[in-house]
Amino acid sequence: MLKINAKLGGTNFGFDVLLRDSYIKPRTMIMGADVTHPGAGSTNVPSFAAVTASYDEDFFRYHMNWRVQPPREEIIADLKEMTKEHLLYYYNHSEKEKPNQKRPQYIVFYRDGVSDTQFAEVKRKELAAIQEACKEVAKQYKWEEDFKPIITFLVVQKRNHARFFPVCPNNKTPAGVDPKQGNVKSGFVVDTIITHPWQIDFFLVSQNAGKGTACPARYRLLFDGGIKINELEIKRMTFYLCFLYARCNQSVSYPAPTYYAHLAAARVKLYCNNKFDDIDTSAGRDKEEIYRDWKAATDRVNDETVKNMKTFIDNNPMYYV
């Protein structure tokens, strides 16, 4: 029922107003991004990028868009256009009355699936794409010239080898810890010793692991918009976003917008199943030419989806959950 309600435009839960106003500034758009890749050995299937963005004050509803990518390409190639679509969707669905209050003043971007060696490239290319999107939307739709949302860019790393256990002096189980599991409590944070010495870098165990050992997610701040951002606010905002995943009434292992981006990328991969079988991907063909053929095929898939489901998608933008 939780999933169905979210698909049909309902709200399962949201931020407590006091918590929301304490840790998230007004007119904030929270985005999540992920790229799904083909299986090992697949040469005739591209990667798919999906980006989600909140458009309500409860940070429960997220608009989604997607693009095809060259195989194994982690940098989101068309992030600028995708961000422009999200900015316009946020503006058109804002509950504010004044036009200047319908534009996001802050953007928090959670980027999934990036390794340490890709940090510099992702920051250089994807951050620039978001900034260019804001600039072009402001110019095209005659928003104020100084429309420059403050961007907070965070990387989410789900796959890591860190595991944490509560200290048990004299073999006594600490209060609140299940003796059968031995996991730390939900909300446990490690931000010293094994993290970066001066950048905002922390591990967060946000979920209650029912079985086995809880796996933490690691978060690294790559850009803070030129302002001295409060580290505690980032940690709490990240933790609370883990409670807003529509399918579950408990906290999950990483923030809902990133989770949704992962679901969306997997869904569009199914949309395009068997759509690339007739495309020549032999070694002799130019890679750009192959990519254009892939893009044309996915454009047809997108057109068919919109044609068949336009009214449903317009009324239920979270159909992909």
What are the residue ranges of the model-derived segments?
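Long, contiguous domain-sized segments
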Residues: M1-V321
